[in-house]
């Protein structure tokens, strides 16, 4: 049985978060953790936090199944766009530039299975 973890309203642009999500898609959980720990991207900290939550949710939903990190696989991971906060930056000649502070929603689903071969 699969388990899911969702991280909402993360103050990172979805484009930057999707780069990190693509690194661990289809990988085993222990490999994904190693990739994220060695990543220099700031978004990798939030992804590893959500990945740990998904593994804990799997253990909670399946108490009889003692699956380790090497048995669980990141089945699906996707990033949706969250609400955008709009700010104004003063510009020359009485104008204003719009600054869009983007956010995103991260969803990770883990399940027992084989990693996806590329």
UniProtKB/Swiss-Prot annotation:
User: Which GO terms of the cellular component aspect does the record hold?
Assistant: cytosolic large ribosomal subunit
GO MF assignments: rRNA binding; structural constituent of ribosome
Which InterPro entries has this protein been placed in? Answer: Ribosomal_uL22 (IPR001063), Ribosomal_uL22_bac/chlpt-type (IPR005727), Ribosomal_uL22_bac/org-type (IPR047867), Ribosomal_uL22_sf (IPR036394)
Alphabetical list of Pfam families matching this protein: Ribosomal_L22
Q: Which UniProt keywords apply?
A: Ribonucleoprotein, Ribosomal protein, RNA-binding, rRNA-binding
According to its UniProt entry, one GO biological process term is: translation
Matching PANTHER family, A to Z? CHLOROPLAST 50S RIBOSOMAL PROTEIN L22-RELATED, LARGE RIBOSOMAL SUBUNIT PROTEIN UL22M
HAMAP family, alphabetized: Ribosomal_uL22_B
Q: Which NCBIfam families match?
A: rplV_bact (TIGR01044)
Primary role: This protein binds specifically to 23S rRNA; its binding is stimulated by other ribosomal proteins, e.g. L4, L17, and L20. It is important during the early stages of 50S assembly. It makes multiple contacts with different domains of the 23S rRNA in the assembled 50S subunit and ribosome.
How is the subunit organization of this protein annotated in UniProt? Part of the 50S ribosomal subunit.
Q: Which family does it belong to?
A: Belongs to the universal ribosomal protein uL22 family.
The protein depicted here goes by the name: Large ribosomal subunit protein uL22
Organism placement in taxonomy: Bacteria, Pseudomonadati, Chlorobiota, Chlorobiia, Chlorobiales
